[in-house]
Amino acid sequence: MKIKSYWDGKESVCIHQPKPYYTAIPGYAYGGLIASLIDCHSTGTAAAAKYRSEKREMDTLPPIRFLTASLHVDYLLPAPLGGVIEIRGRVKEIKGRKVIVESWLIAGGQICARGEVVAVQLPEHMMPDGFKK
C-alpha cells in the first residue's frame, strides 16, 4: 500500500481508495487497514511538519523521516469500503525530534476512527543509503 499526503492549510490530507480485499466483514474495512492508514499518514505529516518548521522544501537533503513511537486508535464506526477513504491530520506538537499528530479517518461521510501518533525522527546514521541521496 502506498499513500500520498498533502497540506490543506494547517491540516494534512490523504485520499485513499482501498482494495476490496481489505475487508473485515463484507463491505467494511478491517481495523488493521484503518490503523495502517492513520499511522502512515501521521508519520508522513510529522516529516512534512518538520520540513516546514525548518523552512525547507520537502525531500531536500538531508532527508527527514519519522518512525512510530506510539500509535493509539479509537474505532468509532465501521468504515465502509467501496468509496474513497479520507485521512486528515493536524500537528499537536513539535518538540526536538518528536512530533505528535492527531488524525481522523473519514469514510461514507462520517468520522470512523481517530488516532494519535507520537513520531520520532530517524537519526541520519540509521537512514538507508537509498534515502540519503
Question: Locations of the language-model features?
Answer:
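Conserved beta-strand residues within beta-sheet cores
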Residues: 2, 15, 68-72, 86-88, ...
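Amphipathic alpha-helical recognition patches that constitute DNA-binding helices
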Residues: 33
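Hydrophobic residues in beta-strands and at strand termini
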Residues: 16-18, 75, 121
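Non-catalytic linker/capping segments at the edges of enzyme domains
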Residues: 1-26
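Hydrophobic beta-strand-centered segment that forms part of the acyl-chain substrate-binding groove
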Residues: 44-86
